[in-house]
Amino acid sequence: QTDTTVGFSSSNDEKLSNLDYLQMILQKELEIRARQKQIKLRRASKLPNKVCELSNLNKGLEWQIKQLSHLTWLNEGQNIILLGKSRTGKISLAVHLAETAIDKGHKTYYAPIDTFVSIVENKDINPKAGAAFSYMRECNLIIIDDVFYLAPTRSELQAFYRAVTFLNETRSIIFVTNREISTWLDVVEDKHLCQTLLDRITANCQIIRLTDR
């Protein structure tokens, strides 16, 4: 007969207690591993250290930003164009969306357009560039900053077009730019290729204009 005297636990209680303890240890281990994975993904993403204060963004975007944070667009393979002048919070919002994706286990990668084009052009001859491009191919989300901030050369535009067309087949891309989309054609030599690029990236895309508060 099991001893039920105060100060002693029954054999059933003891077994249950041990099981609870093991479950607690397992849960803690899973939490540690999940956190370590997030840290690893954050480091690999090359995201800038930006803190997104959503309260500092245009008030008219609150509902849209809340919807974006649900990541439905990412699961559906949509692109996003963040458009606005300097200091309107484009990068902060891009980082916020990327970190939200990382929290859900998605691989992401950030690069300014000049870095992105350099990686694409040198991926077959430079091991570091090759590794970066290979990682991009594993990602669910890529962020390209400063799109057409400076006019690309013909060869740069061609490299950009080829890479975006390839990568956009199976993943979402966030394009960050301070240049109105309608003026992209004005800064390139090959306007036909640029128009083809525009048609491609805007076919399944949300365009978000950020303005001063």
Predicted regions and their residues:
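Phosphate-binding P-loop
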Residues: S69-G77
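Interdomain "pre-motor" coupling segment immediately N-terminal to P-loop NTPase/helicase cores
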Residues: T2-K46
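Walker A/P-loop nucleotide-binding motif
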Residues: G77-L93
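N-terminal pre-Walker A segment at the start of P-loop NTPase domains
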Residues: N49-S69
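Post-Walker A helix-loop "phosphate-sensing" segment adjacent to the P-loop in P-loop NTPases
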Residues: E99-A111
